Amino acid sequence: MGSGDGSILINSIIGLALFAAAYSLWGGLAAVAWTDVVQVIVLIFGGLMMTYFALVNLGDGGSAIDGLKYVYETVPERFSMILSKGEIITPNGNDAWFDLPGLAVLIGGMWVANLYYWGFNQYIIQRTLAAKSLEEGQKGIAFAAFLKLLIPIFVVLPGIIVYVMNLDASGALAVSSLDQGFIGENGAIINDNAAPWLIKEIIPVGLKGLILAALAAAIVSSLASMVNSTSTIFTMDIYKSIINKKADDKSLVKVGRIAGLVALIVAILIAPQLKSLGQVFQYIQEYTGVVSPGILAVFLMGLFYKKASNNGAIWGVISSIPIAMYFKVGPNGWSSLSIFNHDIPFMNQMLITCLATMFIIFVVSKIEGNQDDPKGIVITKKLFSTSPTFNLSLIHISEPTRPID
């Protein structure tokens, strides 16, 4: 138990960091991948069990399906992904539209976030690049897409369940009777504490340890992958390419471990400061959006615009940072156009930044004379070909689900 001074948080952070370092720094990507196989099984099973027992509890003696119907009938608006401005106000008084800005969820910045994260982020694609063959890599992507479909069940749904469990007779959130674990230092409601509260209140004693282990597995898995990616990028793209071009494999391994260790130390120092941010995941997504649109724009233009130049890419990615930061700290009122108001949903900010960066790359490349790059990648149909197994998997994954009867 904690003493109230935050020591349990610090000890947990250090413990998880040391555990992740133990196998990611010395075992490399192979150790990370094999450990994740076990961790994902524990994570999915534990998450599904948490949701199941929570739904059974709401089912008033019935099944989990009865509980799900009760939740949907009580707060149907919480299952909507396309929101209008002012449609849902969060318990902290914020407009949920700023997180899910209407159709932008489907045709706007959501694509920027997803394409960057799943297609061009070293943290993710390192697993695919390490596959034995192209076909094996495609199978891994298809399986990951299937697992992604399960996330709403044990990540989103438990939060909605906790919300329903804390409603008063009038259907409003009973703020005055909320568990103190939901109340932050400034009086704001901490949404991220929904899962721990649900585990404490609903889950049988025998399963609490398993579900907590599942949560720890998710943290360690992400941390180990990030450490491995950080050490790889620093070692190969900075140390090997700039500092010591003649470094042998032994030196590279040593430098990679040191880089990963330094990254872990920095993470340990920063992590305790994040507890005051409310929804940490939302905060990470928003500020990752400062750099991701520019990176995505460079890759897309490089792949699909054969006359894109190196200077165009450089100017584009450099320009993307001040463009993105304008929406965070820039002044209001210098233009009547709403897109120049930095108080807009971060998903829309990401889309505008990405489009602006692509335009800069196009203009700079055009000024340079639009010369074909002899070293560029030649795009052919074969480059984007997929196996029949992969295609069938995508068909099943993309099939629409039936609504709750």
PLM region descriptions:
Residues 1-394, 398, 402:
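Membrane-embedded helix-loop-helix hairpins and adjacent transmembrane boundary segments
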